Amino acid sequence: MIVLPNKVRIFINDRMKKDIYLGISNFGFENDIDEILGIAHLLEHLLISFDSTIFLANASTSRSYMSFWCKSINSATESDAIRTLVSWFFSNGKLKDNFSLSSIRFHIKELENEYYFRNEVFHCMDILTFLSGGDLYNGGRIDMIDNLNIVRDMLVNRMQRISGSNIVIFVKRLGPGTLDFFNQTFGSLPACPEIIPSSIPVSTNGKIVMTPSPFYTVMVKINPTLDNILGILYLYETYHLIDYETIGNQLYLTVSFIDETEYESFLRGEAILQISQCQRINMNYSDDYMMNIYLNFPWLSHDLYDYITRINDDSKSILISLTNEIYTSIINRDIIVIYPNFSKAMCNTRDTQQHPIVVLDATNDGLIKKPYRSIPLMKRLTSNEIFIRYGDASLMDMITLSLSKQDISLKRNAEGIRVKHSFSADDIQAIMESDSFLKYSRSKPAAMYQYIFLSFFASGNSIDDILTNRDSTLEFSKKTKSKILFGRNARYDVTTKSSFVCGIVRGKLLDKTSLVEMMWDLKKKGLIYSMEFTNLLSKNTFYLFTFTIYTDEVYDYLNTNKLFSAKCLVISTKGDVENFSSLKKDVVIRV
């Protein structure tokens, strides 16, 4: 670790796929409480800008931090990627403090699309922020557009809070020129912020929250000490369904269960977690997980790898102490209990956006202060990989699991999805057969539409057959290469439970690079949040899908795009009753 005079921390990570990865601690949407919710997220969208033909890049805003990364591709170099990311924050050597009202307006529209996307695919319920005075969703809404001047002032104010002590930088390589460049830019920031934000309200413990969830989960408040962080790292590397959450200076260990009986036994104090020592902790974490640790605990004074001897040699005492602290918090009700609930009618409170939720007090009734049994945890495997065809009945459940777990990755091709994970076969089966997970998987049907229409366009099966078997979608034809013939109509309107645009497009010069560039152009116009595309077996032919509340505008953009020599687009309007009648005509597509 290299520390600049103003406390900027720089780490060299040659295993990282990104060229540069930058994080800002104490800079997430928890700072929006008592201001306009969404300022942090809006700032993230305003800052990031790049040429998608020579860079891959992204940014994210969480409860307590913001992070940005950039990677060079094609003709660009690592140095180009570093300078591009730095340019998001600095202009002519000075920290950016000016944002145009037109740009703010476009990005607020994009935020509303992101809200729609996340609520269609996920259940966006941030319990900790809600209990601390925020909302269940804190990413920004369209009503911010009514206060553009106030929003702009808040954005400038937020930029002035950036300080060297908040900055963490990962780079693949660090030569003298790059180090000098960092000194001239991020190294010029004050060591402490010029504007000190007000303290975040203390979140409420001893609560039961009933909300959509794939698991029975409890957040256990523990002290944010070095040993407890090392204990969390130990548990995270060894077991599934264990993680942590932070808000302000508070730390919660999150433990999830698939069995309600074990869950309630743990909450009553009847049982403790069965934590066993593994052979060795390697700290082989992803760069995302490492960055999150440094940002959530900015007081860490060493490289995490400096603690690898301690975490292995002292693991027994670290885990015993952590286990005792967990049990004490259970008994003292320093916990937030999350019960899966999918009833739209059950509600006793709402946030300011009128999202319904049930919040109750966690009482001491039935507590047993002497545990007499232990609960085994799901152990991680080194690596596992499966391929699921689009005709497999487990397709949607696997997609739901990957969306709810950050350490599961999936990649689509024309025949199915390839899933990388670290579960045992028995554990993954137990999760997918659990009552709460099945209800969660079925509670958000929007994600299924992407695969219903992918199956329709790529298989030649009728929409009636596909809808009849929508829980498994129909298997694609794999014996022969499909030849897709486009009909006369370019647009077909349907009614579903979601608002989206999808379809197939073909073009002689069409490739993934041009589609990514198209997606970013649509994002800049505020028309979409993201766009998925799958390369079909037919040459230069892709399937596109994007959730959007601006369906006509997106259709007009795609319909007039000169890259497409042929297209067949479906525009879905959200309604209570599905109507696919326009797709039953044989003129749509032939295989």
Curated annotation (Swiss-Prot):
InterPro entries the UniProt entry points to: Metalloenz_LuxS/M16, Peptidase_M44
Residues that, per the record, bind Zn(2+): H41, H45, E112
One Gene Ontology CC term in the entry: virion component
Active site: E44
Cofactor entry: Zn(2+)
Pfam families with a match to the protein in the record: Peptidase_M44
SUPFAM superfamilies given in the database record: LuxS/MPP-like metallohydrolase
Keywords on record: Hydrolase, Late protein, Metal-binding, Metalloprotease, Protease, Virion, Zinc
Gene Ontology BP terms: proteolysis; viral life cycle
Subcellular localization, as worded in the UniProt entry: Virion
Superkingdom field: Viruses
GO MF term (any one): zinc ion binding
Co-factor: note: Binds 1 zinc ion.
Annotated function: Probably involved in maturation of some viral proteins by processing them preferentially at Ala-Gly-|-Ser/Thr/Lys motifs. Does not seem to be responsible for the cleavage of major core proteins.
Protein family according to the UniProt entry: Belongs to the peptidase M44 family.
Designated name of the protein: Metalloendopeptidase OPG085
